[in-house]
Amino acid sequence: MVVREYNEEMKYIERLSPNSFLIKKGFQSNMNVEGIFYANSRLEKLMFDELRNACRPGMTGGFLPGVKQIANVAALPGIVGRSVGLPDIHSGYGFAIGNMAAFDMSDPTSIVSPGGVGFDINCGVRLLRTNLFEKDVQPVKEQLAQSLFDHIPVGVGSKGIIPMNAHDLEEALEMGMDWSLREGYVWAEDKEHCEEYGRMLNADPSKVSLRAKKRGLPQLGTLGAGNHYAEIQVVEEIYDKYAASKMGIEELGQICVMIHSGSRGFGHQVATDALVEMEKAMKRDKIETNDRQLACARINSPEGQNYLKAMSAAANFAWVNRSSMTFLTRQAFAKQFNTTPDDLDMHVIYDVSHNVAKMEEHMVNGRPKQLLVHRKGSTRAFPPHHPLIPVDYQLTGQPVLVGGSMGTCSFVLTGTETGMVETFGSTCHGAGRSLSRAKSRRNLDYKDVLRDLEEKGISIRVASPKLVQEEAPDSYKDVRDVVQTCHDVGISNKAIKLRPIAVIKG
């Protein structure tokens, strides 16, 4: 690994625009393409401070700085375009979280890397709208928060309440939301408003280890811990009236529910299993990477194909999981307001993944190419008229759901043509950490965090209060900076801002 002083490092980084920076070849060894990252003045300071700290003598351990990780990904075989760092980027395993990279499927050397998807495969966000307003919910907010907390199993070891045996799990892994529909947990229209219609067709449960299945079986329909949550939110601002109305959001004060969850221990095990296999494949195929954490396999190798099939099964698990929680959320609201979910107009606006690798067609040097697009902490953001987005959103572009940190605002964005060209149809996914979990535990007190939420008028139900400081707003970048940066560089447009009034957490 190249070790240089900070001033030397900065010679390889060039400002392209007020909010974008080019990472030139040579910043890390063997770069096949350049890197780029997007950041406004506040976010760029975090990026460069991280790099400066890493240049100090004796600084070892932990993950590499985000800029280095972007450059190491740029050195992977078969990468096309640029290795992209989005404004919410922070260091992660192999790839930074908030890193997008696309690989040419016609190139026999191209790879797939579990580190480019993440351990929580198809961690993603679903947004439901309602016909309720803040004035309807405010008087019963505490009861409603409790009702949600009672209905949705949360926390690290939480067990699901959706009846599930081993045979059901096999079917769910293969069918995704089609299983949820057959079993009566979702409405038929929910699938239409879901990335991939809630089902990755190349899923193959036989490529998933027994251990992963054992971990996943009791966890279906559970929220999990970490940064996962269910939030009752209020529409606070509408930036794009036309796009909002297409999503069924007509007025300020309207109530929505956001569910942020993934594939739980199941996806984690799939990733862990794949990394072991890929280390062997790298030796056999003589694949060299700059960082051991970037374990990978040729896309067309048995290990590469097995991982993609198992990853797709984990993605289906996550969609079934969010669908089960949608069912439980609808039940909780219906019970509280003594009516039906239908009468409350509890429709799914959209469901997006922000940890996945997918085969997509994109233009590269003016020609269409099949690419394997890795999005880790990055959301698909396809433009208007794209064939893969629902009929309802053909004129607006795909909705993009960006969850803020706990107690801060969330946003709905829409995809753009610029994003299609610049980032292969990708944008940010959230606020992005500015403090590691360990630092958050050392520097913040969970009681202060809970008090702060109460002062903001946010009801909170949390399974593990002592984990709360890891997710405190002070542990994260400001999601407003992240979303505005994406808007300013044109890779997504702001449509709606949502403010939380109740949070359910693991």
Curated annotation (Swiss-Prot):
EC number(s) reported in the record: 6.5.1.8
The Gene Ontology CC terms held by the record are: nucleus; tRNA-splicing ligase complex
Gene Ontology MF terms in the entry: GTP binding; metal ion binding; RNA ligase (GTP) activity
Q: Does the keyword Manganese apply?
A: yes
Keywords for this entry?
GTP-binding, Ligase, Manganese, Metal-binding, Nucleotide-binding, tRNA processing
At which positions is Mn(2+) 2 bound?
Answer: C123, H260, H354
State one Pfam family annotation. Answer: RtcB
InterPro entries recorded: RtcB (IPR001233), RtcB-like_sf (IPR036025), RtcB_euk (IPR027513)
Q: Where does Mn(2+) 1 bind?
A: D120, C123, H228
Name the needed cofactors: Mn(2+)
What are the binding positions for GMP in this chain?
227-231, 354-355, 403-406, 410, 429-432, 505
Which one GO biological process term can you cite for this protein?
A: tRNA splicing, via endonucleolytic cleavage and ligation
Q: How is the cofactor bound?
A: Binds 2 manganese ions per subunit.
Q: Which SUPFAM superfamilies does this one have?
A: Hypothetical protein PH1602
Q: What class of enzyme is it?
A: ligase
What family name appears in the similarity comment?
Belongs to the RtcB family.
Q: How does it assemble?
A: Catalytic component of the tRNA-splicing ligase complex.
Function summary: Catalytic subunit of the tRNA-splicing ligase complex that acts by directly joining spliced tRNA halves to mature-sized tRNAs by incorporating the precursor-derived splice junction phosphate into the mature tRNA as a canonical 3',5'-phosphodiester. May act as an RNA ligase with broad substrate specificity, and may function toward other RNAs.
Additional note from the record: Ligation probably proceeds through 3 nucleotidyl transfer steps, with 2',3'-cyclic phosphate termini being hydrolyzed to 3'-P termini in a step that precedes 3'-P activation with GMP. In the first nucleotidyl transfer step, RTCB reacts with GTP to form a covalent RTCB-histidine-GMP intermediate with release of PPi; in the second step, the GMP moiety is transferred to the RNA 3'-P; in the third step, the 5'-OH from the opposite RNA strand attacks the activated 3'-P to form a 3',5'-phosphodiester bond and release GMP.
Q: What is this protein called?
A: RNA-splicing ligase RtcB homolog
Provenance organism = Anopheles gambiae
**Which classification does the entry list for the species?**
Eukaryota, Metazoa, Ecdysozoa, Arthropoda, Hexapoda
